[in-house]
Amino acid sequence: MAFCNLISRGWNQFFFRGFSGESLGLLRMYIGCGLLFFHTYQFATVLTLNPIGSRNYFLDPIWYFHLLGIQYHIPALSFIVYALLMTATVGMIMGKWTRTSILIVILCIFYLKGVRDSFSGDVHHRYIIPMQMLFLFLLSRCGEVHSRDSRRDTYPPLQEWEASWPIKMMQLYVALFYFWSVIAKVRVSGWEWFSGEGRIQEVLIKRSVRWGMTGEGELVKNSLSFELAQRPDLIQIFSHLVLAFELGFPLILFIKSVKLRAFFLSGVIIFHISSFILMDVNFLLIPFVYLIFFDLVPIHQWLKIHAWRLFKRRPSMAG
């Protein structure tokens, strides 16, 4: 019985403590701001198409397009859906019809992601984390704080447990996302992935030669990747660092120090930047989701004070 009580207290302490309703509302706003940039970056290729161009059949439609019978692309529709996506994201930020806005964002992402993946013939996974977060926002009462909805209607105050569980679930999902990526690597390639002359070296070479070579025999792009591929000793060191941080990522859930958390996540950001430069793994903007690991109330207050001071300044008239 004592052991069960201990487990129960630990469960409650982890999932239902630590955040206020204000924290949840601010997280919705800041994540929404990050999504504005993320959407544009992810769907830039779709937006380069001629909006009044001809319809094109998908050679390999994504599974849910196939299920719904969507067989071809209407260029103008993608632009309409993108405009709706950005409008709904702004609605999410402002807290205007919050749940409806979040639901529209999710549906628009499904459509535009389906278009992009059906063209490329490959399923991209960069929206996995943001989509899980949007789903948890949808289930939560995040639209009742720091929102237009809260000015229109009167809501009862959010209890600590109501504000904490969505954020803690987001944290847990992100931590396990990195942890399970190690399991996925080992399942696909075995421990060879983390050897100096294994899978990483192969990917580096492929990424460096994918753009071809000049007439002089020089690589058109990513020559740094090719140079690194010739150094299996360095690859071994980097691969072990990646192994350590991915296996150890769940430990961030128990780190109380804000500075230590920020230091760890800074290293993860450097990892994503390096992966983008060397291996063209395009998770470059995903670090905006790391805001879930911080209480944004003091950060927001600090920004309000300093931003207000900045806008209060006026250029002096010379002469």
Predicted regions and their residues:
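Alpha-helical membrane-anchoring segments
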Residues: 1-319
